[in-house]
Curated annotation (Swiss-Prot):
Gene Ontology CC annotation, any one: cytoplasm
Active site: C82 (nucleophile), H205, E207
Designated name of the protein: Imidazole glycerol phosphate synthase subunit HisH
Keyword terms, alphabetized: Amino-acid biosynthesis, Cytoplasm, Glutamine amidotransferase, Histidine biosynthesis, Hydrolase, Lyase
Amino acid sequence: MSTIAIVDYGMGNFHSVARALQHAAPDADIRICNRPEQIDAADRVVFPGQGAMPDCMRTLNESGLRAAVERAAASKPLMGVCVGEQMLFERSEEGGTPCLGIFPGEVRRFAGPQFADPVAADQAAAAPPAAARERLKVPHMGWNQVRQTRSHALWEGIPDGTHFYFVHSYYAAPSDPALTTGVTDYGVAFTCAVAAANIFAVQFHPEKSAEHGLRLYRNFVDWQP
């Protein structure tokens, strides 16, 4: 039986992820883990996250779990989800936060005239009413299509163009295009899935994405990188 550790550093929807994994892979031993030795002992690791990047990195560091996540990323199948995907990169524009630096690249905010960004109050005030209505809201929230840019074992049984559920204001921008395995359009074409060696990570929430999200988790449990 495969043991899967869900990293619990205090900033994520860990129980929702656990329920989805239990449904997708009832033969697996799913554990929410908040101690390094638990993560070290697991066969596979799921690294979720939600909230502000400065808070996520601070709590990860303070929890003592950072080194365990880094060891897992170097040695066993690891799946990052939402902010857990973003944290794998070098830095985030959110608070200028240094991240784990496992992948080259940065995390950027949706920005530009096509977005009705609530943090840009002067932009909203200056915009004509019709133009403001046409702008895309930030955060990007809801179902959106994922284009698979290259084949991967975790895409097995999931049609290209499948819709997954997103909730985010920032997205990963890899320095190495070869990392990208999925792209979504929301005012800009952005990377929503990355993969290299034993790591696969997604911006969307598989646990909120119905049957295809469960299939992605099942594929992760079966994956032999």
